[in-house]
Amino acid sequence: MPSKSACLRHTEAPGQLEGRMLQGQPPNTEKKLIPTPGFLPASDSQGSETNPMPPFSIPAKTSNQNPQTKANLITPQPPIRPKLERTLSLDDKGWRRRRFRGSQEDLTVQNGASPCRGSLQDSVAQSPAYSRPLPCLSTSLQEIPKSRRATGSEGGSPSLWSDCLSGMISTSLDLLHRDAASGGPPSRLASLHASHTPPAMDLSIASSSLRTANKVDPEHTDYKLRMQTRLVRAHSNLGPSRPRSPLAGDDHSIHSARSFSLLAPIRTKDIRSRSYLEGSLLASGALLGAEELARYFPDRNMALFVATWNMQGQKELPASLDEFLLPTEADYTQDLYVIGIQEGCSDRREWETRLQETLGPQYVLLSSAAHGVLYMSLFIRRDLIWFCSEVEYSTVTTRIVSQIKTKGALGVSFTFFGTSFLFITSHFTSGDGKVAERLLDYSRTIQALALPRNVPDTNPYRSSAGDVTTRFDEVFWFGDFNFRLSGGRVAVEAFLKQKPEVDVLALLQHDQLTREMKKGSIFRGFEEAEIHFLPSYKFDIGKDTYDSTSKQRTPSYTDRVLYKSRHKGDICPMKYSSCPGIKTSDHRPVYGLFQVKVRPGRDNIPLAAGKFDRELYLIGIKRRISKEIQRQEALKSQSSSAVCTVS
């Protein structure tokens, strides 16, 4: 009677062969198997003697039946897991979490829950072990054809079956068999270690988006909930006192909290106890109080830009105003821009549009005023318009006979927080020898300007009815004062031709305005920053040469910016210069950069309530965008038309 192993070797059906593969048993064949790449080839000999395999784990029932019948009765059933009824991928979620029922509890006890554990560690097969990898195992997981799975189907040689079964079982199963055969604890993935020590970081880069969303991570489910709870605690203002920071209680760096709200929390009792009509300098929650001022200006200093330019009535405006409004010497833009124009262009609206276009959407036109050909425009950062009072203006005409208001003064005033400002732009009488007329223009201006009107004086005890400059905390007076350099053109040109640098201090000794200010006959209490630029008048249009006409006017510092303060040291000049690149007029624009001390105020003043020129704002933005599109199209056409030549 033939042995059981012999019967099985000659009578195994395809379905039985598949069952052996699913239980981890190799197919027993008498023919040579084609080796799979990456595995050890089988021996050239036939039979189980030359290719030893571990004994089968199929229990044999003792019976007197025919061996062929016994072989047919021994039909191993595939395990419930893994199911190879469909094509699986190593990246499939179910494949990463697969576990055998018999080893699931043991793995949990031995290894514990680790969010860094891989799928190969979590899957351990309870199957017989083999001393070396099987030649029929492949790296692919293919679906077993149903026609081949039917029990009792026949046909095909063992060699053909080995070729067909190649690629049915993945490398993962092979690894699991090896782990089970070792008898020890399941293998673990090696810990990840940096190849080198990373550099020290001074910023927190904690981010929920960088956290691995591993399904085996027990903390993943409630991670978002914990983060939301932390933010609620950080931004909660229901406590008995105001937190020190909107980010109080949060362990994130301020630099990494860009998605958090940086608005200061407002206590409910501050809103209920506060009265709009009766403000206080130190009232908590006051709109113009110290607390609000500290939010925007911690050092209580605001940046101010003041400029003057005699445009000579030219209709043509410069192609760019960047050098005028955005000088390269300033790293940052200013909080307030005040521009005074004398002999302005006929289209005042176009001029203001150009200013809005240059400054961009971060600034709005707070107010603008005109007196004949005298223009003044005030642009402020859009987030500061809520702290301005109503803007008032007044005018003075010094040339009464003329119907055209070319000479005179224009004053604009308002209060910012608790500091009152007065800006005056003037065009005094021209002529080398008309110093007395210019002194008269000054006296008439300080007496005739009727400011302020509705906004109360911040310090009425230090005000004078005969001098408008005494009624405000900070005063800036700028314009074309027409004071000349005495001594004649020849003497002035001799100074200008000095090399390598012009001795400006020696040149200013001949300045009429400097001489009159030292006498105290004009601009009493005013100061001027040191001058380090060349005379701003009179140039040939479009050129850097001074007047070459028959009149041969003497180069002079006619365009000036002066300042005055009630409190000494409140105004600090940062830069005082001219714009030699703007050559559309016979005058060069002159500007000054200042830091001005700002004090808290009361809420009982008439506020502008965010009023600004909305129409001009929209026009400036549209023009800015259209020019940017044109510039980009020009760059594209230029790059596409470039020709590369090889010589």
Swiss-Prot record:
It catalyses: a 1,2-diacyl-sn-glycero-3-phospho-(1D-myo-inositol-4,5-bisphosphate) + H2O = a 1,2-diacyl-sn-glycero-3-phospho-(1D-myo-inositol 4-phosphate) + phosphate; a 1,2-diacyl-sn-glycero-3-phospho-(1D-myo-inositol-3,4,5-trisphosphate) + H2O = a 1,2-diacyl-sn-glycero-3-phospho-(1D-myo-inositol-3,4-bisphosphate) + phosphate; a 1,2-diacyl-sn-glycero-3-phospho-(1D-myo-inositol-3,5-bisphosphate) + H2O = a 1,2-diacyl-sn-glycero-3-phospho-(1D-myo-inositol-3-phosphate) + phosphate. Residues 52-243 are annotated as: 3 X 4 AA repeats of P-X-X-P. The modification Phosphothreonine is found at residue 197. Sequence repeats lie at residues 52-55, 76-79, 240-243. Residues 60-75, 120-129 have a biased composition (Polar residues). Interacts (when prenylated) with PDE6D; this is important for normal location in cilia. This is Phosphatidylinositol polyphosphate 5-phosphatase type IV. It comes from Mus musculus.
